[in-house]
Amino acid sequence: MKHFLSNLDLHSETPQDYESIIFGAGCFWGVEKKFWQLDGVWLTSVGYSGGELEDPSYEIVCSGTTDHVEVVKVIFNPEVISLADLLKVFWECHDPTQGMRQGNDIGSQYRSVIFLNSELHKNESLSSLETYQDELELNGYGPITTEISMMKNYFLAEEYHQQYLAKNPNGYCGLGGTGCSFPNN
């Protein structure tokens, strides 16, 4: 399976000196578009993560019975874009206080998550959550419900979903943030 825009193989290994992270912030179509446009992002793909079932389908994930989340895997060059920059995009692109939904998209598969493969990334992600929580509270929002944990699996979604908004520019995207900017250090 190839990336619709870059033509890279979606099964590619992460290049040496590059890093990866998985974000869930609602429907994966809009979330992926937020990240594929960034300088320093080498490859994006959409998939399912967090549940126990091996290689689930979209239909079974949407049933809410597998505990999987619709996610975007982001492989990036940390010499060009930092994890802090990616986290800023993540926090600002959705409302992390909504629990098991994002806007009109309702269900556990739309919950806010960050899945990591590095303790260093985990610490930076947790710190960014605290920073953004303070900003949200100043603007009347409740607690962030984002799950931050080590990645246990990642299954590519069906080709139809990969880079969906590049293939379907007028396709549905219910992604919407809080309007609160991530504070600059």
Write out the residue ranges for each language-model feature:
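Flexible coil/turn and secondary-structure edge motifs
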Residues: M1-N185
